[in-house]
Every structure is written in structure tokens, then in C-alpha cells.
Amino acid sequence: MLTSMQDVPPAPPGTRIAYSRGEFQVGDLRVPSGRGPHPVAIVIHGGYWRARYDLKEVEHLCEAVTRQGLATWSLEYRRIGNPGGGWPGTLDDVRTGAAHLEKIATERSLDLKRVVAMGHSAGGHLVLWLAKQNAIALRGIVALAPVADLRRAWELKLSGTVVADLLGGSPQDLSDRYRSASPIELVPLGVAQRVLHGTNDDVVPLEISRRYVAAAKESGDDSKLIEVAGAGHFELIDPQSSAWPVVKETVLELVNKTP
């Protein structure tokens, strides 16, 4: 079983574009062949917000999505261990990077009326958070095994102290930060959400997605949980896996969804 998408050969690179001045404030843009304007998938990688994981994790996913006719805008961001990473820099970068599409849309022939955001693991947390920020209009969110409840993740000690490392402390000490950063506390998001989670995920418990979607539905959001039978954590970002068709179809459903 894959332990990381870094275990497979690299995909062809996208076009690297800076959305701010810092070393890690960049994104990789891939645009499909043919005339635009092209719909867009904002893609945010996971890795528990830590610096040792980067956007290489989702290169193959981006290539596969681009083959379906969508441009992909894969964001790097300051992470725990980078200068300025954690609270609030990590979140600020995601918001700024997403908003940067407005500046490059005309030149790159991007259709900003058809934008979805997809993220994996910690990136799933970040895309759900992004939906509440009004950085850019979104048709929908595809959250793949998201860390959607930061208080619960802290209670479970997922990846050790990483949630406290991200936000700077515990929920008891920094309740307002958890309230501002945790998707389950931000619902309703007002954007369609499709949450995919493997039933064999041993990195982010399925329980977290179940709790999140229940809360989102209760708030009135169009939120749906898709439990992918037999899939672990990384199969959801592997275009060669048996889980990929449902990921692909979910992205296409949302990008073509009537506003």
C-alpha cells in the first residue's frame, strides 16, 4: 500500500507562478489543451501542514484532473517548520493563493464561473476553510479524507501535537483560533461539499468526516459523505487506484453543477 504519493515517479511539471513574495507562496498551473476558457480546480496538498510535505504529493492528481478538461491551480503554502508557517500564515497563504486566480484568469484563459476546490487530508481541511473566506466564488468543494474537526483531531492526538503546532496551542488555551480555523465550527459554508473518505483510512479517522458532514447537513449545507470501500488514505489521490473513478466523477459533477 502507498504511504505517500512521493513513492511514485514525478509527473510532468506545471507552470510555477508566484502569488506573493515568499519562497513557498507559489502555485503550479496546468491548463488543458484546446481553447478556453477552462474550468478550474484549486488543489491543496496535505501532509498534516508540515514542511516536509509539499505539492509534489498531488502532481499526479493534477495531471489526471487536467486530462478531464480542467485547469488545475495547485497551491504551495507556508507550513509548520517554514518561516511564517502555522497560524495565521498557512491559512493566509491559501486565501491569497486562491484569490490570485483573479489576476491570471484572462491571460491563462480560465473560467472563474466554474471553479471547484479540492484538497487531501490537511489540504481537505484547508479547502473547507477556504469556502468560508470569500476569496473566490466556488461551485463546490471536494474534500478527500479531510481533517475537518480540529478540536477532535487534537483530542485524538492525530500525528502527535500537530494541531497544536498549527494553531499555537490547545483548544482550552486558544478556543477562538480553533473556532476560526476548524471547518466543523464554520458551517454553514454555503457551498456544495462532497467529502470522500476511505473506509480503511488509518491516518485520518473516518469518524471525523462523518461528524463533519452530519454537522454541515444540520446547518443546511449541501454536504454529502462518500465512503470509499476498502480505500486507505492515499488511494484517494492516486489516479491508478480503484478509488480514483469516484474522485474524478465527483469533481466533474461539481464543476458542472448549476449554480
PLM region descriptions:
Residues 30, 203, 210-259:
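C-terminal catalytic histidine-bearing segment of alpha/beta-hydrolase fold enzymes
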Residues 129-174:
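Hydrolase active-site cap/lid region
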Residues 55-73:
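Short amphipathic alpha-helix adjacent to the substrate-entry channel of hydrolases
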Residues 85-106:
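Alpha/beta-hydrolase active-site loop
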Residues 189, 195-197, 201:
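Short beta-strand/loop motif that positions the catalytic acidic residue
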Residues 1-35:
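N-terminal cap/lid segment of alpha/beta-hydrolase-fold proteins
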Residues 119-129:
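Glycine-rich nucleophile elbow surrounding the catalytic serine of serine-hydrolase chemistry
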Residues 100-116, 121:
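Gly/Ser-rich "nucleophile elbow"/oxyanion-hole loop immediately N-terminal to the catalytic nucleophile
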